[in-house]
């Protein structure tokens, strides 16, 4: 769950040396046969591929890669050249003139800034600028504004993943040379893809997030029973504090989420940005489009005080994971965020037998509430050999710091010492 917007970067880095690059024509690149069997095509819009065809490859277990999600981002104007997220999705097809078959797909964007990625490379852009080089545009395989690990390259059954990964990497390098992109970044991939890309000599980067895991709890109290006495009392006080103020919660799913709910929720979401003098990444049209096109994946938790809503949190339902994504409120209240974003989600997972909550970026305070620190990954290809070497050295040192932090942070978990969770 996004707790708050992240600090804005310094101005002047967002469009470095892209004046002579027509970003709107990226997807017009001529299809080049890459192997005797397959060819790669880059498309400037998700509308250039049929939704059923795309979704057959991506599956339904990870909602953010669904055609409907990417389409909502485009149609609402959240991903385009103006926002720095120009779609350029990669399709791998059989190399036949008649009825080519889609056998792999990958989300891809040409980026002219580093906003909304949650893997921070502003210092890399700084270094390029200091040496008179352009860091932007860069190529990014990610889900915009969504720091949730999941599939990044989806491949048909019976096709060698290693072959597709090699093929895509080769074509990415050609594309980067053609459009003068500095690099390719694969953000929050699954471990198997990260390993495969490491074998192709992409640099590997680690990060940390906090996730909740369901040990087949029968109820919230059974989860609390795993806490030490003091931590258990603290959490119960937090929930009691909210209940004593007369705040009640509605867990709305699918078509039970109506237009007025979206209006209230967007007011909450927007407030988390406006209070810091920033415009939100997403607009109200994006959320209403999600409600129309993929309601089966949505859980909206709304907090009501007396006769009006005061806070809300939006979750996405995956195959075995509840993804906490956006939240906001119009009344600041102690513990309201924890109840709306964490405890309501835990209640829902226990009731519905969901294995895990992925709460997104940030939030060290989640640890003492039972969210475990977990390692996240990203993979990076840097075209410039000298910068690639320098960044590799930086990442080696950073990775050690991350590993040390993961071990240290785990010591702050609230669980009883006699339990192994």
Predicted ranges, named:
Residues 1-421:
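N-acyltransferase acceptor-side catalytic subdomain
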